[in-house]
């Protein structure tokens, strides 16, 4: 009888081990999209600040440390596993060793393209220099 109980418990333990969900080591499409939405929100926050204050507002992008910060606000950190590629024009100011995205009082910007990527997926965030509009599209 004891052997039957031990065998039954072993079978239940084996089934639980096989059926338990395992944490993923890679970033999925939904997580990458969520990070892209957070970054685009910071860009939009910078534009809104420039429009409401009537003065320039810089959004500092630090791809090496994976941090983004609107002037006067707390920085956000991009989660581990997400790489950032940041390209701007030469007209964008250098802040903290990298080019910042500058929004002018009328909403225009110096323009830039941020590409967060993970697990072979990329999402392109394009900030139009003329309108300051932020567009997000899979690459």
Model-identified regions with their sequence ranges:
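N-terminal signal-anchor/signal peptide hydrophobic helix marking the start
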Residues: 1-10
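N-terminal helix-rich module
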Residues: 9, 14, 18-139
């Amino acid at each position: 009888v004891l052997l039957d109980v031990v065998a039954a418990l072993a079978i239940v333990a084996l089934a639980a081990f096989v059926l338990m969900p395992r944490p993923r080591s890679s970033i999925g499409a939904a997580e990458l999209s969520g990070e892209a939405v957070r970054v685009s929100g910071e860009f939009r926050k910078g534009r809104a600040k420039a429009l409401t204050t009537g003065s320039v507002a810089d959004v500092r992008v630090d791809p090496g440390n994976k941090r983004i910060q609107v002037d006067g606000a707390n920085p956000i950190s991009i989660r581990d596993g997400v790489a950032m590629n940041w390209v701007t024009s030469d007209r964008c100011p250098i802040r903290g060793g990298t080019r910042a995205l500058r929004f002018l009082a009328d909403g225009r910007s110096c323009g830039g393209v941020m590409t967060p990527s993970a697990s072979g997926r990329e999402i392109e965030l394009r900030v139009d220099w003329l309108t300051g509009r932020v567009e997000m599209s899979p690459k």
